[in-house]
From Swiss-Prot:
Tissues where this protein is expressed: Produced by the medulla terminalis X-organ in the eyestalks and transported to the sinus gland where it is stored and released.
Localisation: Secreted
Keyword flag Metal-binding: no
Top-rank taxon, per record: Eukaryota
Protein's name according to its UniProt entry: Molt-inhibiting hormone
């Protein structure tokens, strides 16, 4: 019985530590694997992801943050969020930033 409890506890610790490695502790946000150009461009990534965060706060829809970030922000939801955040006048700047984040794909 004691061995089973220890094995269960060890398995839980391994899972918790393993999943914690998937999170960026500096920003406490999930590392987006779809954007290959994030490394070296974290400042751009933070500016673009802020649009999705603002949109999620505006609409409060479950899953909206993921839909906005889908395909490294190259989707219709990101454009909707850009308009909802009243930042559509900056669309050309965001297109350049998104192309940088999508570099290498």
């Amino acid at each position: 019985m004691y061995r089973l409890a220890m094995r269960t506890w060890l398995a839980i610790v391994i899972v918790v530590v393993g999943t914690s490695l998937l999170f960026d502790t500096a920003s406490a946000s999930f590392i987006d694997n779809t954007c290959r150009g994030v490394m070296g461009n974290r400042d751009i990534y933070k500016k673009v992801v802020r649009v999705c965060e603002d949109c999620t706060n505006i609409f409060r829809l479950p899953g909206l943050d993921g839909m906005c970030r889908n395909r490294c922000f190259y989707n219709e939801w990101f454009l909707i969020c850009l308009k909802a955040a009243n930042r559509e006048d900056e669309i050309e700047k965001f297109r350049v930033w998104i192309s940088i984040l999508n570099a290498g794909q």
